[in-house]
Every structure is written in C-alpha cells, then in structure tokens.
Amino acid sequence: MEGRKFRPSLLAGMLPGMSFAEKAVLITGGANGFGRATGARLAGEGAHVVLADIEEEAGRQAAEEIGGEFIQCDVRDPEASVAAVDFTVEKFGGLDIAFLNAGISTGCGLVESFDLELYRRAMQINLDGVVFGINAAVPAMRRRGGGSIVATASLAGLTAVPFDPIYAANKHGVVGLVRSAGPVYELESIRINGICPGFSDTRIIDGFKEGLVSEGIPIIEVEHVVDGIVDLMASPESGNCHFVQAGMDPQEFRFRNIPGPKAAEA
C-alpha cells in the first residue's frame, strides 16, 4: 500500500528525522472511522500497526486490509488496555505510538432523558478509556526511551455543547487530561496530545448527519482529520490540543491563561 504524502504545512512541525517506518503503533477504536483510516495511513508509511476494538469481526477485517494485527479490546476495562499494549510489545518489540481513539455518542440527555447506564458507558469509553490507555502505554514507552500518545477529544472538548452536555463533559475531561499529563511525561520523552475534530464523516454523527447537511454545516472528511492526527504523532510538542475544521489546516488551539492572583492590599 502506498502511503499518502504529507502536505508541506504538516512536515514543518515534525521531529527532525521523524519517520513512521518500523514504528510500533497501537490504535484503539481501530475498526472504523479515524482509527481505521489512521492505521491505513501509518501502515502505508511502513509502521507496524495493531488495531484494537471491541468489534472483533470489523476489527479483524480492517487489520487484514491494512496488513496489521488485531486484538479485541474493551477500553472500559483497564486490564484490556494493558493486554493490548502487551500484545503490541510481543508482536513488534515495543510501543512507539498510541492513538487512544475509542469513543461513542452519549445516547441520553441530562435530565428528562437521562439514563444512568448510557451515561456511565459514555464516560467509561470516552474518558476512562483514555486514562487506562495512558496508564498502560507509558510504562512500555519508558522501556522504549520515549513515545507519542494522541487522544481523540473533540471540538466538544473546547466549547459548550448544549445539545449533548454529557458528551461535552467527557471530552472536556480528555482535553484537561492531556493538557495536564503532557508536560509531566514530556520529561521522559513521552509526548501526550489531543486531537479535537469538528463534525466528521464517521458513525458518531449518523443519527444527525442529515440535519447538519440540511443546515449547511460542512462535514469534515476523515482523511483531513487523519492529517492532524499524524502531525501530532510526529510533533515535538506535548500537552497541546489541535482542532480540525472543514476548509482549514489542523492547528493548535490557543488556550487563554487565567490571570494570576492579586495580592491583598495592606
């Protein structure tokens, strides 16, 4: 498979001499969407890719198509994340890159349509899955001398989402997690960043895609988001979030600093 060539704007921020060839990569939520497309891109660049997903049939098919490996993984279970990392290390001798991408829509509201089971499922997959993924990946990357972790957040992690506050809550959690963990593990040459796409052409918008189109809201192509993902994987930065919008290059979101405390007047 011939790898897609990076645009010059993406290459500028890459680590000197960074290549995906022979890198060991683990991708959760790898059976479809961003996970599958990123796996295909990296495999085309010569990486050794493990796709992890709870959907076994679709995951195995995706792995076969890109020439990678598959392991069934429920990211709600911390032991499953450890097993996925161990599988990658066993197959390819280590772990260089982890793309923590598993995610779902909420399926319930905050009050009238609130459902405790759906709420917990969304929080476990979208937020706990990233926590467990980092927890499992960091020790393996330490043994490798460093690595890169990218977590899928969302524009919902950067702004208010009145129609799905629970989804916004777990995606804000992912943003806060990578911003806080990134500077800590950067000291060990392990970079942790987040990717925050807008409405993209994946299954997560299937229930309201028609409405978006009718309102004239552009749907982002999956490959455009993958551009931003692979850019972050190769970037020297850590603790940052990049957003992806239709018609714009993926770019860093600039958070405002909170003013410091003011000393009390004597």
Question: What is the role of each PLM region?
Answer:
Residues 6, 194, 211-255:
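C-terminal helical subdomain
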Residues 154:
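Residue(s) in the substrate-gating loop at a strand-loop-helix junction
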Residues 134, 170:
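Active-site helix of classical SDR
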Residues 159, 168, 180-190:
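Active-site-adjacent segment of SDR/Rossmann-fold oxidoreductases
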Residues 13, 105-120, 163-166, 206:
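Conserved mid-core segment of classical short-chain dehydrogenase/reductases
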